[in-house]
Amino acid sequence: MESIVRVEHLSHRYTVDWAIQDINFEVNRKGILGLLGSNGAGKSTTMNIICGVLNQTDGTVYINGIDTRKNSVEAKKNIGFLPQKPPLYPDHTVDEYLTFAAEMRLMDPKKIKQAVEIAKERCSIAHFSKRLIRNLSGGYQQRLGIAQAIVHNPKFVVLDDPVLCQIRDEILNLDV
């Protein structure tokens, strides 16, 4: 089976200290990979490099067979990303935020409304469409972050601490 993500000899240094060194792994289509480790182990650094938020010091990341250093724009089209602290805009409604996220992903304007509805349903936040983000609980703000990561129907999703503020029994109801 062809991998959707392949990481080869990935390393990153912040000034003097190495955050990660010589990491290798693959994620196959329909596969799941969890990065586990203590605080400061390099989990977020690895995810940020895969998603193109941070440049690696050494090594190569392939997304759907594309070397991200050679064609990062094409590679990023395949990725949905929820950072550890997603940038939420408190004065926007849920619908406005998800529409903006879809527009930033250069989605066909004719498909955005339906994509927003699907993402809200998959994350169980459809009933908050017109609510301001500031008025959502931390758990629902996290679900909104997940919805923005999947609104453009990416080939794979990278979620950094996705169950933050979630009730244990409700985590299983997310359709991501």
Regions found by a protein language model. Give the residues of each.
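A short, flexible loop at the N-terminus of ABC-type nucleotide-binding domains that lies
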Residues: 1-7, 11-22, 29, 71-72
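Walker A (P-loop) phosphate-binding loop of ABC-type ATPase nucleotide-binding domains
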Residues: 38-42
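Conserved ABC ATPase signature
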Residues: 132-136
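Hydrophobic anchor residue at the start of the ABC signature
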Residues: 146
